[in-house]
């Protein structure tokens, strides 16, 4: 599962939303707001750590435009990807393969801060692979993602994602 897919899973668990949840979280911010997330995948041979910084470039009633820079470490090797722009439509994606499995509220500590979060549990099947996840979202963080955990039939250990820094303008 890629970082983009993971973030999409985090934001698409409502049944069915009238507004794209990813758009809603970014629409509450001003241009220049950003979030840095760290994703860790443990494999049999090595840990893979990805750090992504997503910055809001523009927000309109129809869309939010973000740019993400990503650096991935495979053992002692590091790969930096070129910045990627993404338009997040205000309209939800009707083809989203997500099935909500539970919803609650919880207070957690992220980057040393206590945050009240909405917790979503979900299941999905994509390309014949079943996955489960749990995501903590909050309007305090640009983009909304505080923390997520994913498991899959083909992953030897859970994939974990957590916001480590952010600035909301």
Q: What positions do the PLM features span?
A:
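Sec-dependent N-terminal signal peptides
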Residues: 1-13
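Acidic, serine/threonine-rich low-complexity disordered tracts
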Residues: 15-169
């Amino acid at each position: 599962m890629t970082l983009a897919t993971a973030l999409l899973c985090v934001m698409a668990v409502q049944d069915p939303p009238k507004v794209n949840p990813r758009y809603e979280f970014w629409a509450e911010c001003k241009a220049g707001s950003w979030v840095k997330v760290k994703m860790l995948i443990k494999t049999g041979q090595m840990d893979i750590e990805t750090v992504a910084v997503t910055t809001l470039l523009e927000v309109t009633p129809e869309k939010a435009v973000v740019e993400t820079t990503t650096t991935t470490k495979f053992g002692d090797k590091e790969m930096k990807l070129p910045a990627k722009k993404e338009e997040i439509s205000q309209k939800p994606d009707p083809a989203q393969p997500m099935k909500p499995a539970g919803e609650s509220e919880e207070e957690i500590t992220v980057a040393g801060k206590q945050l009240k979060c909405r917790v979503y549990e979900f299941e999905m099947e994509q390309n014949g692979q079943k996955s489960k996840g749990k995501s903590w979202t909050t309007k305090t963080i640009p983009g909304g993602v505080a923390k997520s955990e994913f498991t899959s039939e083909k992953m030897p250990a859970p994939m974990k994602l957590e916001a480590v820094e952010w600035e909301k303008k």
